[in-house]
Amino acid sequence: MLPANGQTAVIQSKTSSHGLPLVVAHGRPLPPLPTPYHVRVRVLAVGLNPTDYKMVTHFFMQDNTAGCDFCGIVEEAGPQSVLGLGLRVCGADFPYRPSNPYNGAFAEYATADSRHLLRIPDGVSDLQAAGIGAIGWGTAALAISDPAALDLPGLPSRPDSRGLPVLVYGGATATGIMAIQMLKLSGYSPIAVCSESSAPLCMSLGAIGTASYTSVTCAEDIKAIAKGSKIKHALDCITDVESMAICLASLSRTGGRYACLEAFPDAWLTRRAIAVKVVMGFEGQNVDVDLGHPVYTRKANPALHAVAGEWARELQLLLNDGQIKTQPMQEIGGSFEGVIKALEMLQRGDVKGKKLAIRIAYSK
């Protein structure tokens, strides 16, 4: 039964006594179902992403709910929902936009498009499911399949037989881990740039080789792993001056495609024959997002919404077969207060190579 007196949620607030402008608020309105395809989910656990502290820091919106990745139980469904009541699912919403004040994962209830949610098999825990969420795989999906990004046609259901090498810089990040698996299962040969300690994980996920980002010969090491095959596709999950330089140096002299996840100064782009796109995972939701910044402001894109839906169907089959792995998980206690504590840990850089998850409720 839905709460009569509103819900508890983590919201953005200038009155916060924390390092981040976040507080736990009570009596919050439940988010509406914005389309007939949406469902309302009772949140069981949430997964944290760097975007959750970056957005509230750089694009603060007073009183907006926070949080993207969640796992929960479907308790209300729109008339065209593809999911029934009572199902345990994982997914995400992008709450960091002015037109979406009440929806977000860090709450007792969240809404999401049923076509982009994954049904959770019995062998996957709530915390693991929150770690899968949708931000990581959704961002990777758009980077891989968007014609303006890497424009790679392969999918797990119809792999590309060419085995093209694809560079994944930040292979041990949440998005990188999903990208390596999705690329490998789609017929590609992912090459991961990561720390030496994360190399075994990236190899176990399907990377054909790894290069250390601390190596002075990183770009040469990447090319050696490709064994003479020209690298024409790079996904940069870090997006700083060093990562971009290595990606551009690794791409073929004849050009290629570079997808990254954050805006960058024009001076970093030292090669003009490279097609570049800054990938925003929220483009898969088919909503207008205006953050007052030219790079991060996007119009609703039905084509990318369809890409995300297609990959959701692909991921569902892989999840059912046990073929999808997440980052190593670390549970943080404290429910909603624990969410704020964990985000501050992420912001300080206290967490390396792990996905933080917080229990919000238990299945009834």
UniProtKB/Swiss-Prot annotation:
Entry binding sites for NADP(+): 51-54, 172-175, 195-198, 213, 261-262, 351-352
Q: Which reaction does it catalyse?
A: 7 malonyl-CoA + acetyl-CoA + 10 AH2 + 5 S-adenosyl-L-methionine + 2 H(+) = dehydroprobetaenone I + 10 A + 5 S-adenosyl-L-homocysteine + 7 CO2 + 8 CoA + 6 H2O
Q: E.C. number, please?
A: 1.-.-.-
Keywords carried by this UniProt record: NADP, Nucleotide-binding, Oxidoreductase
Give the pathway.
Mycotoxin biosynthesis
Keyword Hydrolase applies: no
InterPro entries xref list: ADH-like_C (IPR013149), ADH-like_N (IPR013154), GroES-like_sf (IPR011032), NAD(P)-bd_dom_sf (IPR036291), PKS_ER (IPR020843), Trans-enoyl_RdTase-like (IPR047122)
Q: Which family does it belong to?
A: Belongs to the zinc-containing alcohol dehydrogenase family.
Q: What is this protein called?
A: Trans-enoyl reductase sthE
Organism in which the protein naturally occurs: Phaeosphaeria nodorum (strain SN15 / ATCC MYA-4574 / FGSC 10173) (Glume blotch fungus)
Taxonomically, what lineage is the organism? Answer: Eukaryota, Fungi, Dikarya, Ascomycota, Pezizomycotina
The gene name on file is sthE
